[in-house]
Structure formats: C-alpha cells, structure tokens
Amino acid sequence: MPGTAIRDIAVVLSGGGINGVLLELGFLKRLRESPVWPRVGWIYGTSAGALAGAMAAQDRLGDLEGFLLSLRAEDVFQPRRLWQLPLGGLHDYALPETMAERIGDAAELGSALAAAEIELVVFATDVSEHVDGDGSRHFELVYRSHTTPPDTMGRAILASAAVSALVLPVRVDDVIATDGSWVRNFPLEHAYRNPDVRAIAAFRYLASYRPSDVAFVQRMRERLDRFRAVPPVRALLAELRLAEERAGRGEPAHYPELIVRLMRVAIARNTVLEERLAADRETSVLELQRLREEIVTAAVDAAPRRRRPALRAELDELFASARFPFRHDRHVPCLIVRGTPGEDGLDPSFRAEPPWPEERKRALIERGYRLADEELARNADFLTREVGKGRQGPGQAVGPRAGGRSGPGEAGA
C-alpha cells in the first residue's frame, strides 16, 4: 500500500444519528489537524460512525461536510403514507439513493475504500431468519474494507446506518442486515484486539431524547370525534384517549413507542458494557504487569547471584506464556471524547418538519471539533507515553473513562 507513515492508531466512532455524525465530523476534522492523523491505520464505526468513517478513510471530510450541510430529513428516511405503515415500516430508506447521487453508489464507495490506506471496519446486526438453535451465534456482522468485495462493503455501510425503528433491513449478499447499534454501538473492543494498534482515539455520542410527541394522537381524536356515533369509530376514540392517558403518566402511548424505548435501552446497555469491559480488562493488564514486576524482582533478589539471570528469564517466560482471554502483554492508551448535542441538537426522529437549519448543523460540527480539541489539550502526551511501561495514575485520560483507564479488545466475529 502507498505511503511510508507508521500506521498504528485506531479511530473508533459510535452510532448517533444525525447529531452524532455532525459531532463526529468535527471530531475528525480536529484529529486530522493533529499528529494523530498520519498514524491512523483503522477506523471502526457503527451506524453514523460507519458513514463518517467511510468518508474519513478516503480523506474526504470536506465532501462529508458539504453532504451533511445540504442533507434534509427526507433525504435519509422518507415518511410513508399511513396505509403503508403496517407492512413497510415508518419510512422508506432514502439514504442509499441520496448517497449515490451526491457521493457515489455502493460499489464506487467500496472500491474507493479498498484502495484507501486507512482500513474501515463497520458493524451491522444480522436479522436473517435463523431457525436452528445455535448457541454460538452472536448476530454481529463485521465488514473490513480491505478484504470485503467493494459492492458488499458499500451495502454494509448502508445496512449499518439503517435505523431499525424507522426502516426495514437491507440485504447484504445472503444476509439480512440492519443497524449495527443493536449489537456493537461503540466498537472499542475490536480496535483493542487488533495486535497492530498501539493507541486509540474514539468518539462516543451521548444520546438525549425529547419527550414523546403524542400530538398526532390528539389530532386524530379531534378529527374522528364528529363520527363518534359510528360504533367502530367510538371504540377507536376510546383507545386514543387511553393512549393519551398513558402518555400523561410517562408510559409508552402505543406499542411502536415501546419498541423505540427498548431499542434505546439495548443500544445504551451494550455501549456501557463495552466501556466497562474495556476498563476492567485494562485494569487487569496493568495489575498483572505490576504483579509480574514485583514477583520477578522479589524472586530474583532472593536467589543466589549466579542463578539470577536464568531465573529472571524463566519467570518472564512463564508470565509471557500464560493464557488469558485478553492480551496481557501491553496496555493501549485510549483517548475518548464524549459528546452530547446540547441546545443545537436536531430532531432525531427524521420528520420533515421542522427542517434542519444549516447554522445548527455548523454549531454541532464546531462542538465536536471543540470537544476533541479540549481532550487533546488535556492529554498532550497521548502519543508520547511509553506503551506497556508502568502504571497510569487516576488523573491521566488514557482509558475508556476520560480521566483514567485504557481500552478493550476485539470480539470474535
């Protein structure tokens, strides 16, 4: 592959919808201006992170910014007519056609990524009909741009971003795939398990949600009220009133809202567990290194002088050959930027109204840039720390938590 830079850093991008991809663009723009960027060899992304990562891997952040600034809600998920909803989902998936017109179709995107120096790794959820009881199936789909056929890779990126609460899944070769956030919203583990990765820079979108909007239920009830003498309409009006009462108590007004809430729970939980696993593993690595140093030093000091070199070699070999379910010969500095949309957040429900103002999009990009800049300033020695040497103090942001611990490992997929 072209280029002479040593590429030993991974970038990890979480899912996050329209707000997440704008924040991630700002984060990536700041990384590109830093000493981190020439060393980036891999981008691991899910959903919004897959889209941002696809453009970043090609060094097309300017094109991504132009694309996002011109993007309307209906360019991503086109609302469907009421009579279509029961069988076809709430929206049509318009993003593939929009991207084909403005950026390139799936095959073109995959071909460009195959030739890029930076490898993109994206994640989707397998929702194929599996009728056999396979206890080892984890439903995670992993696609790597340097080994996946271009057309497949392009469709995998689109599948990763197909929000399940809004649209039907996408076929990728012989698999039915959808939003990767269900199984791997923040793919830290995969980056850590890559033996060539020496450091990780990541962005995690912290979602916030607006109160449920039941105005459409009220409007429907008001329109139907004049037909309340008709028995079926009267029964429907009673159900609509019950839905409004449930909403007033903070309960899901209707079944689709329950599914949306469960989706949020699943995504938030797998993200939190990903970081927790990362922190636990890195703590184990650092403690094992400390224990190894103390045991070897104590044993060698107590041995006869002539025996010390051989004993040290034997003990080092013993520790090195130990089998653990994670790499224990190194720790990986991991800088994580976390971002919320704040007051400039766009409506993530992809309704056509209100529109997405350009000034708020620019504010989100700037917010992501600023958050990255602040984190890099707090960790000015991020790339100069010795990997695998000593212990990190609680004030050093080298791990899954800003302010203290290092990153995780790649699940078998």
Q: How would you name each of these model-derived features?
A:
Residues 10, 84-211, 320, 325-340, ...:
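Active-site-adjacent alpha/beta core region of enzyme catalytic domains
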